[in-house]
């Protein structure tokens, strides 16, 4: 029995002798949380979802506000294995259920109907459930999801089973043993997701780890590769918090509030076919301007105009390719969006003009938080239009972010999106080339949940779901903000393609914005994770992504930075970024040896830009992925399904070293079946990835310009050719103006090149051309790969047949031997990157903010000074036992599993992973660590 000190209500909990001590600890811990919420968090809200106990609860001041029609109450009682759960004022929290709190109300196979195209099915629990489902936000056209196809007579290969448990809709799909699971969007951890669990709840996840369960974006989507290589995509089309449980082998489980449909894509012949089908529903990636595929240099922050100019000048002086320089939040006046600090950035138009003269673009940040300040034109105009998100009592919600107290636009309203788009249009007149939407989960300071109350109200458009609580719109807030920004940029320049980068997103965000993997750490672990994270986003419909190269938080070492740049230069989105109070993280900041590796890496990228740009054209027009796991080359091969240090850019395979002490030339490369020919640009280095081209392929290359604007139609065109077993190869090249929309009006050139060996001659010719753009008179340079870094070169004119004479077998063997010798010579003569700053046992990061040692009673904590504090280590002094964030989380959740059952454990992970519980624990230890009751 535990007595609530506030309302004298008894909380009856059944104790088990086996876990008695843990039980008492947790009961006391959460009694204090409920009773001391006001003192602990300065009247700030603490929200969590517990599906098997109550729907939505918010601890604020001395009451518990239960959303969804439940009135305020001062406490609530929990009675294990009772048929009703009541608040002290007698209001039922859950519907009456028989027996245990996890009793199943209903279950069965879901009913289906074909939609969209052949092989795509919608599943609902019942006709009533279908009618109760909210509109789709992920679909380009929500009506498509609601319209069954009448001429399709297929039946699905796999039928989901549903259960209604404790007010939750649980959907399970069982697949054949040996199935590999991928997708889940922006997720840390391994590439193959079996054994993992993800919660779709957009979260400001600074310094996330490999086990973090909620990051900045939500993709309730799983890609399953069956044992025979066929693939199936499964979408839980809900915007609410959703658990994706992949802990059981070959089993997919979704848990969320009802009602939501399940959409399956396939099974199709390959994972690429599934992603193409998904793009028909959720849309393809926007066509990026070509300059956005170059290298981007960012920093939180370049503090003033002169420093930006200095960085730009240094890139050109050091002959390091770069296309974009970014301005983080400090360019603003007092962090007010759409303003410029008059002292530090007095003339943004002149700055942009200067950058443009150097061939550089400028991208500027815009956050959703608008300072609550009369006289500030953005606040005044938004208030006049009444477009702010509201609290449950109808007042504008005010939360603290960078400017201080802020209001937040309600992007679920067309009027608010139009208002924001007009602001963006005016902002672009300063010469802004691109916009960066940050903090749009939305992140809010000084709250344990790091976001706004779920009880806040959005007055959404009917086609989005109408007026709903924030819990419904939270996961799509970033998508809708990115959409508004994108539309504002189109208003400003109808003949320029917008470029928007968004931190938060949802399935379908690729229609409006690129993304990155958030606030990572300068560690070898995060370098490793960056590859599967980029690939998972691509496998979830977002092909334009990349990490903060070098790591955002912490000081990279020279070797870590150089290795990361080598890999990052091959990602679809290529940007270096670091946080304030770290050392400089520009390519020249780590010594001459690292600078040279960065130069070589970025020159590689710029050579490959014609190929990368072509991949994005195919992604935009056909929904094909850009960067893919290497099992895409042979989905039937189970040995390829967990490879995390290699990936494909079309037929180009990038093999990277992700271990600190493992140089690339010492590694054994696991290649897919078939012909894979190694090559380089006479730039091989132990810290750069190895490159292979698949037999049967042709890719186009360009000179390594300093920026995209230097390229010309009359530049030499280089074709890299790798013949297959039949002596043939084929590839495409897409060309247009690199910006604008003429390509939609036939103003482009799509060339299919072919190569074929006949006897001792290989002929290279144009097989097909699409588009009205005329072929320029330019030289054609063909390199025919022989393997072992050997090649035969020939010159001709683009558009004319070029014939290459193949030497004898002995001469080819000698060329291969010579190529291998030259490769070894380049490796041995390269200057290794020193790493004297990376001490033994250290993961490669020096925290940019010195941890503060704090002690409370029997506990010692290390906290990184930050907004609200970040706990990085805990130790129980009497036992000298350290507790990492994950380990201590497991202890707490284990107790919850024993006390309240499986669903409660899931609910607490869904909230905020380990940081939530540890933040609570820290606050309690600080208040009660020395108390006898604790």
PLM regions with names:
Residues 4-7, 12, 27, 66, ...:
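Cysteine-centered motifs
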Residues 10-31:
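Hydrophobic alpha-helical signal peptides and transmembrane signal-/tail-anchor segments
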Residues 92-95, 99-688, 693-694:
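Catalytic-domain carbohydrate-binding cleft regions of carbohydrate-active enzymes
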Residues 123-125, 654-657, 762-770, 858, ...:
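Short, well-ordered beta-strand segments enriched in hydrophobic/aromatic residues
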Residues 696-801, 823-825:
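Accessory, solvent-exposed terminal regions and/or long lumenal/extracellular loops of proteins
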Residues 836-934:
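Surface-exposed acidic/polar loop and edge beta-strand patches at domain peripheries
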